[in-house]
Amino acid sequence: MFELRKLPYDTNAFGDFLSAETFSYHHGKHHNTYVTNLNNLIKYTEFASKDLVSIIKSSSGGVFNNAAQVYNHDFYFDCIKPITGCGCGGSCQSMDANLQAALEKEFGSLENFKAEFIKGATGVFGSGWFWLVYNTKNQKLEFVGTSNAATPITEDKVPLLVVDVWEHAYYVDHRNARPAYLEKFYAHINWEFVAKAYEWALKEGMGSVSFYANELHPVK
């Protein structure tokens, strides 16, 4: 059985990006519901003893939707962090040199990467996610937009960064202003986490996805 992961930060520390109320609903209710639903759906089935990634890759329907949403939310919550009290609005965050070089090689510049990321995430129709992934087939970084519960790990693409563009992720604080939410999201990206995900993607490929998920949800 799976458990709701704990968040690695104070949910009151995000200023006008995300309120504690948003975390209370997003993590405490939405995310928790996916965990609860998944446990109820897999009880007494062949999925009961499987790890999260294996369930995602071998299921469909309700089991897939809830398992994928557990993973998607786990990853999203690790992709953000509070800004330190330096007054820079997140602009002084240092980026790992290898990650920066890879982004500049693929997207031309960090400025262009940001512009394309926000444009792509703004353009996701309806509910979904916008990802930066490492494609294990061509060894390139690329953007992927997914709808509803869909996740790029089913296509052997390793997530490095994701933003949740379901309205429940931002409506309390930003109403229908998705672009404003995305600007704030970008300022709160946990680049250390993204760099580590990239490092392990290069070393282990899709194995890094299972390692990440199993650390949060060890098979019992």
Curated annotation (Swiss-Prot):
Coiled coil: none
Note on how the cofactor is bound: Binds 1 Fe cation per subunit.
Keyword Mitochondrion among UniProt keywords: no
Enzyme Commission number(s): 1.15.1.1
Catalytic reactions of this protein: 2 superoxide + 2 H(+) = H2O2 + O2
Keyword Oxidoreductase tagged: yes
Known role: Destroys superoxide anion radicals which are normally produced within the cells and which are toxic to biological systems.
Transmembrane segments: none
InterPro entries: Mn/Fe_SOD, Mn/Fe_SOD_BS, Mn/Fe_SOD_C, Mn/Fe_SOD_N, Mn/Fe_SOD_N_sf, SOD_C_sf
Keywords recorded for this protein, A-Z: Iron, Metal-binding, Oxidoreductase
Assembly and binders: Homodimer.
Family statement drawn from the similarity comment of this UniProt entry: Belongs to the iron/manganese superoxide dismutase family.
Species whose genome carries this gene: Campylobacter coli
Pfam families referenced in this protein's UniProt entry, alphabetically: Sod_Fe_C, Sod_Fe_N
Binding site for Fe cation: H26, H73, D164, H168
SUPFAM superfamilies assigned: Fe,Mn superoxide dismutase (SOD), C-terminal domain, Fe,Mn superoxide dismutase (SOD), N-terminal domain
Gene Ontology molecular function terms on file: metal ion binding; superoxide dismutase activity
Major enzyme class: oxidoreductase
Cofactor dependency: Fe cation
UniProt protein name: Superoxide dismutase [Fe]
